[in-house]
Each structure stands twice: as C-alpha cells, then as structure tokens.
Regions:
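Membrane-interface loop-to-helix entry segments
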Residues: 132-190, 241-246, 372-381, 392-403, ...
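Helix-loop-helix junctions that connect adjacent transmembrane segments
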Residues: 3, 9-15, 127-130, 161-293, ...
Length: 451
C-alpha cells in the first residue's frame, strides 16, 4: 500500500488551495447549522423566553470574534494545525497538545449525541426500526463522505448548506404569513413582549443560562479554521468569516424572533424543534415532515464536518508528535486520506454511540453538555493565543477581550441552572485529565527535542 505523510502536496503549510472565499463561507454555514440550532434552542427559549434573541446576538458577536482572530492568524501564518498550532506558538507544546486532544475528545462525544438524536428523529417515520440501525447507517454514510476526500466533503457540505438555509427561509416565510394573517391557526399569539418580565422570563439567571445554548448553535467554526488552509488567497479568510457570520446571525435572530412571537413560552418543549412548535396549530400537515428531514440533514452535516475535522487534525497532531506516527500516514489509493486517523475517529464514534444507547439518560446528557463546554474552552484558547501571536491595535485587543468575556459568561452560566450544572463539573474533570496527560508528555517532548 502506497503511503505518504500528512502534508500538503506542495509540502508547505502555506501551499495554495482551490477554495474561493464565498465557498468557504457557504461551507461554514453548512458546518455550523445543526441540531444545536434546530433542537437545542428550544431549551434556551424555555429558560429565558423572548430574550433568547439577545442571547443569539451576543453569541453571534462572540463567535465572530473567535473566527475573525483565527482567520487573521491563518492569513498571517498558514498552519495545517490551525488553532492548535497557534496555541503551541503562543504558549508552548503543552497548549497545542491540550487543544488538539480537547477538540478530538469533545467532538467524538458530541458526534455520539448527534447520532442518537438523528436516530430518534428518524423513528418519526419508522417507529419499529431499532435506534442502533439508524445510528450505524448514519455513521457509515458519514465515513463514506469523508472517504471522498476534501473535494467530496466540500461539495456535500455546500449542498446540505443550501438545503438547511432553504428550510429556515421556508419557516420565516410561513411564520411571516401567519403574523400577517394570511394563515389562520387555533392559537392566540403572544406578540411582542410588553414588559421586562415577559421579555426575560426567568430574570437574569435564566438569560445567563440560555447563553450556552445560543453558543452551541454556532459550534463548528473550528472546522472552517482547518479548511481555511484550502483558500486560494489566505487573506480572504476574514472576509469569508464576515459573510458567514452575517448570514448565520441574520437567519438565526429573525427565525428565533418569529418563533417566540408566535406561541407562548410555556408551549416550547426540549424534545421538539421550536419552529415545529411555533407552527403546530396552523394546520400544516407537511411541515413537521419537512422540518424533521431538515433537522436530520442538519445533524448529519455537522456530524460529518466534525468527523472530517478530527480526522484531519489528528493527522497533523501525529506529525507534530502529539499522537502516534501511525496517524500521519495517508493512503494514495483513498485520495491521500489518513486512514488510521479516520479509523480511530470511527472507533471513538462507535464507543460514543454504545455509551449513548446504554448509559442512563441524565448521565450521558451531562457528558454531552461537558463536550460542548470543552469546545468553548478551545475558543477561549483561540482568542488568548491571538493576543500573543497577532500584532493588533488596542481596539482590536479590546474587541478580543469582549469575545473572551462573552464566552466566559456562557460557560459560567451553566452554574446558574441546576439541570446543566453537572456538565460544567464534568468538563472541568475532562480538561484536568487532558492537562495531566500533557504534563507527563513533557518528558517525551524533551527526548524528541534532544534527539
């Protein structure tokens, strides 16, 4: 079997790619819109009511700051390891190692929960089919997409992005029609909130706790950081990020705003998409089926993006000495795919599925909540790394600090809600375990540097 190292064809980190900025923007939208938005946002609405719109605005701002500094670092110093390479450059080997394995572990856990959600949603049509059959089918499909290589992944994500945006626009159009009185329903609309109590349903604690779910809806930008290496012009990264975040923020805020003005806060259910809930009483028999399909597509898309991301990053980590050399081998017959890296990701995915199906529901919820928080820890590292790596003007640094504060607010907000508080503690435990491994790896790194 012919194999090569996990390097770009040119052998340089800064080698030219074939993506235009708008393709990266579209891919970013595809990799971001997922179950966190279509399903998780219901929990945020239940916690804070109409003020979830403000939560999404703040999350969009925080996410834009993260992507903007990541794109700037990529344009200035293109690295295949993306945020891990910049953390290593800023703080040393331990930081790159910790970021990489933190990203790998959190994504594997999140993918397991996504597969479980997709399987449950699929039983909307096929009640008798066991969950494990759907989970296995979606996992195999995701692996096939990754096996098609970067070009195949790009095409699939771009197509799915269009489908997801179309579904959201369909909701916005239908919701607008109901508010204008063009569609009749058996429900009294709450309309715009006329008091602070109506807007912030559970006061500041509820709003604070809802931030984490707004940030979850923007999860996935790390993959775009990795894909930014494929841009024809690396300096177009910030432009791609601005367009991506503007589109995401616009459709998120408008759709959320419409949903919370159509039905009362008590109608929302954490097991149902808020958009389906909003149109439940408008006699649209096709809508639950269409939107259920859209949610499945969204979840599959983000899960595939995560699998692609962990496969790509583990390959680079192997080259940097942060994973066994086996994972840096690429197979020419399979479009230069790091097969061992994909295999480990698939094995982790299988373990995560089994855990999701066998473990008591609440315990697994804590683990998946922790996985989402771990991803935000990486976002913190991205911003902190940029403060050391980039030469920025004072206002750019202030902007970065604002991003730090927003992410810290979302993470700490989990302490204000007892149902998700254990997830915060689990995230600390997992981060400490990664830190301990990094501490003991110092001897290995010293030996490597000496030799």
């Amino acid at each position: 079997m012919s194999q090569t190292k996990c390097s770009s064809p040119s052998g340089q980190n800064g080698g030219g790619g074939n993506l235009t900025w708008w393709q990266l923007s579209l891919m970013g939208i595809g990799c971001t819109i997922g179950t966190g938005y279509f399903l998780g946002s219901s929990i945020g609405i239940m916690m804070t009511g109409p003020s979830i719109v403000i939560s999404f605005v703040l999350a969009a701002l925080g996410t834009y700051i993260v992507f903007n500094v990541l794109a700037k670092m990529t344009a200035e110093d293109p690295q295949k390891g993306s945020f891990c390479a910049y953390a290593k450059k800023a703080f040393g080997h331990w930081a790159g190692f910790s970021c990489g394995w933190n990203y790998w572990l959190s994504n594997i856990l999140v993918m397991g929960s996504q597969l479980t959600a997709l399987s449950i949603l699929s039983r909307f049509w096929f009640e008798q089919v066991p969950l494990w059959v759907f989970a296995s089918g979606y996992a195999i499909l995701a692996i096939i997409v990754v096996l098609t290589g970067t070009d195949g992944f790009d095409k699939v994500e771009n197509i799915l992005a269009v489908v997801k945006v179309a579904a959201i626009l369909m909701f916005i159009i239908i919701a607008g029609a109901t508010l204008l009185g063009w569609l009749d329903g058996d429900v009294k609309k709450p309309g715009l909130p006329d008091s602070t109590g109506d807007f912030f349903h559970d006061g500041f604690p509820g709003f604070w706790s809802s931030l984490i779910y707004a940030f979850y809806a923007f999860g996935g930008i790390e993959v775009i950081g990795l894909m930014a290496m494929q841009l024809k012009k690396k300096e177009d990264g910030p432009k791609a990020g601005k367009v991506m975040m503007f589109v995401l923020a616009a459709i998120y805020v408008v759709s959320m705003g419409l949903a919370v003005t159509m039905v009362f806060q008590g109608a929302f259910d954490d097991k149902e998409s808020p958009f389906v809930t909003a149109l439940d009483d408008y006699h649209l028999p096709f809508f639950p089926h269409v939107f259920n399909g859209a949610i499945i597509i969204a979840g599959f898309s983000t899960m595939t993006a995560s699998l692609f991301g962990v496969t790509k990053l583990l390959c680079t980590m192997s080259e940097d000495g942060d994973a066994p050399l086996l994972f840096s081998k690429k197979t020419k017959k399979l479009k230069d795919l790091p097969l061992a890296s994909l295999g480990l990701g698939a094995a982790g995915l299988l373990a995560s599925i089994i855990t999701a199906l066998l473990m008591p529901g609440k315990i697994y919820e804590y683990i998946t909540t922790a996985a989402g928080i771990l991803l935000l820890y990486n976002w913190l590292f991205i911003i902190i790394s940029s403060l050391k790596v980039l030469k920025q003007k004072i206002w750019s640094k202030v902007f970065s600090v604002v991003g730090l504060l927003l992410i810290l607010a979302s993470i700490s907000g989990t302490l204000a809600e007892k149902t998700i508080r254990p997830g915060f503690y689990v995230s600390i435990l997992l981060a400490v375990i990664i830190g301990i491994v990094a501490f003991f790896m110092r001897k290995v790194w010293k030996r490597t540097e000496t030799s």
